[in-house]
Regions:
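Pol beta-like nucleotidyltransferase catalytic core
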Residues: 31-42, 46, 51-52, 236, ...
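Acidic, Ser/Thr-rich intrinsically disordered and amphipathic helical segments
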Residues: 48, 52, 71-74, 78-82, ...
Length: 625
């Protein structure tokens, strides 16, 4: 039986911790691609600031209780036993003698934030099922899936077999788990098996290599930091800051968890003896001045030749166009930030600069850590927005539909960036759920994040008088726009239509397009936001805006204007709480979006041309002053 203690962070591969400590003492100067910037140890003020940082993190639920930790360990132990039982049964089904089937093994490995030891309260767990060579991927997505389907503790089970990294998602006894699968070219998988051996990848298919990569990268990051405890607390702070500031999303072109972990790890290498408070400050110092696209690397790339593609701009032309390369330390090395666009890089760099200004003040005792974790007021930054609305008839349809659309939004951002009149297309990573459309005269109205949308399955499947399903669920994303010129006619028809068509094309190919699914894009001015945001959301934005106006030291306006970053030059002259047009502004924009929606089943159904339900957004030209 696999002991639950194997999953405790304090018991993770003890030999690794010992070797790590030895390496820390002997080779502090050699961790990373360069020598350390400073080997200075902590001063009393650094200890004080680190304790204050811990206290500031507590209210945000970044630390789980001992009870929650033990529950996770029990869940992983139970899942491990299920995997072992399944591999044994599947082996015997394939005519393997029972005594041999008992010894072939099979393991569950964790990776991501849980393996790093920085998961927050209620977070999901990324895990990997490793099986011997006679267990196929098809077995995993068929017989293992069926086994889970009938397990009493498993709920919300779904498989994504055709994904870039195939996965089974589930809720196991209250814990969300994403479980990947890798089949190794070995007869058996012993308990104490180290996945860091590059030769394990020999003769594996690319999907297995990609599945293994999460564990291999996570373990390599932990091996390459000089002090794991300092790394963990620093990473908790940076992850919270990134989420609060809307720049934590690999899918939307910002940085995901592994990218933030590597940036923090690099900071730890450069300041190996520093405490977390100092490391957070140095993090902003280093990366606010980083000369992108110079890559961030934690070590010299491995010279392994197993014919898998690796990130190398000298060889691969496409790699030369990556804007913020952060390279994974395990073979095959990949750029974890290939989704980053010009706009998202601009937003991230601006947040780095603001973070540096705030941590400067924190270290001088002028403000507390709470200031770093204040959420910025996105909606007061811009005068113009594109609102993407995704609608469908049922809760299950909406979950799938939103997932597909969100995976494509970064392509819309790239399209908008190509428009010569658009300087910034800043997507807010928050997906806002609307009140049910049938409770608000068919109009979407965003609820605060985390709100539960009431659902009635009987009402969901109820058709209208024409016998068609009606979209009752709606979600929305907001994209803030900055235009380059003061007087311009901007036509976004092609940008929007190409995006909506690509979403429908992908949905149709994946056989997931359902009746009443639709996607629509609308141009909205700041003064119209109240039509889409609930009063509680607007109130929160106003409160945040007032607080930041009172306390925040403004970023250098020259740098912002020079690079046309984040807000139009006249924004600072406008009261952020006002949703009326700026009467003093001379900027005039005509934004034209024709047929900015993609109605449900547009490519499949034959609807009357004048059906208003099918063409929710027709040709529109909006003058914005």
């Amino acid at each position: 039986m696999w002991p639950a203690s194997q999953y405790s962070h304090s018991n993770m591969q003890p030999h690794q911790h010992k070797s790590n400590e030895h390496q820390n003492q002997q080779n502090l100067k050699t961790l990373g691609m360069t020598s350390a910037i400073s080997l200075a140890g902590p001063k009393p003020i650094d200890i004080e600031k680190t304790n204050e940082l811990k206290d500031a993190l507590e209210p945000f639920g970044v630390f789980e209780s001992d009870q929650e930790m033990h529950h996770r360990m029990e869940v992983l132990g139970a899942l491990h036993r299920i995997v072992r039982q399944w591999i044994r049964d599947e082996s015997m089904r394939k005519n393997m003698p029972p005594n041999v089937a008992e010894t072939v093994g099979g393991n569950i490995y964790t990776f991501g934030s849980y393996r790093l030891g920085v998961h927050h309260r209620g977070a999901d767990i990324d895990a990997l099922c490793v099986a011997p060579r006679h267990i196929d991927r098809s077995d995993y997505f068929q017989s293992f899936y069926e086994l889970l389907k009938h397990h009493s503790q498993v709920k919300d089970l779904r498989s994504v077999e055709n994904a870039f990294v195939p996965v089974i998602k589930m809720n196991f006894d209250g814990i969300e788990i994403d479980l990947l699968f890798a089949r190794l070219a070995l007869k058996e998988i012993p308990d104490s098996f180290d996945l860091r051996d590059d030769m394990l990848l020999k003769n594996l298919d690319e999907k297995s290599v990609r599945s293994l990569n999460g564990c291999r990268v996570t373990d390599e990051i932990l091996r390459l930091v000089p002090n794991i405890d300092n790394f963990r607390l620093t990473l908790r702070a940076i992850k919270l800051w990134a989420k609060r500031h809307g720049i934590y999303s690999n899918t939307l072109g910002y940085l995901g968890g592994v990218s933030w972990a590597m940036l923090v790890a690099r900071t730890c290498q450069l300041y190996p003896n520093a405490l977390p408070a100092t490391l957070v400050h140095k993090f902003f110092l280093v990366f606010s001045q980083w000369k992108w696209p110079q890559p961030v690397l934690l070590k010299q790339p491995d010279s392994v030749n197993l014919k898998f593609p690796v990130w190398d701009p000298r060889v691969n032309v496409s790699d030369r166009f990556h804007l913020m390369p952060i390279i994974t330390p395990a073979y095959p090395q990949q750029n974890s930030t290939f989704n980053v666009s010009l706009s998202t890089r601009t937003v991230i760099m601006e947040e780095f600069r603001v973070g540096l200004a705030i941590t400067d003040e924190i270290m001088l005792g002028k403000c507390g850590w709470e200031r770093l974790f204040e959420a910025p007021n996105f909606f007061s930054r811009y005068k113009h927005f594109i609102v993407l609305l995704a609608s469908s008839a049922t809760a299950d349809d909406q979950l799938q539909w939103c997932g597909l659309i969100e995976s494509r939004i970064r392509h819309l951002i790239t399209n908008l960036e190509r428009n010569q009149h658009i300087t910034i297309a800043h997507v807010n990573p928050e997906c806002y759920n609307s009140v049910p459309l049938n409770t608000n005269n068919g109009q979407p109205l965003a609820l605060p994040p985390g709100s539960v949308v009431p659902s009635d399955p009987a009402q969901d499947s109820k058709p209208n008088e024409n016998g068609a399903l009606v979209a009752n669920y709606c979600s929305m994303w907001f994209i803030g726009l900055v235009f380059e010129k003061s007087i311009v006619n901007v036509d976004l028809t092609f940008d929007i239509s190409s995006f909506t068509e690509s979403v429908h094309y992908q949905a149709k190919n994946a056989n997931m397009l359902r009746e009443a699914m639709s996607i629509e894009a609308r141009h909205v001015r700041r003064k119209q936001l109240h039509q889409y945001l609930s009063p509680s959301l607007l109130k929160r934005e106003r409160t945040t805006s007032v607080n930041k106006r009172k306390h925040e030291t403004p970023a250098p306006t020259a740098a912002v204007k020079k690079n046309k970053r984040l807000s139009e030059s006249s924004t600072d002259d406008v009261a952020c709480l006002s949703y009326n047009e700026d009467s003093n502004s001379s900027n005039i924009y005509e934004v034209s979006i024709q047929n900015g929606s993609a109605p449900h089943n547009a490519p499949l159904a034959d609807k009357p041309a004048g059906d208003k339900a099918d063409h929710a957004s027709t040709s529109s030209t909006i003058a914005c002053t």
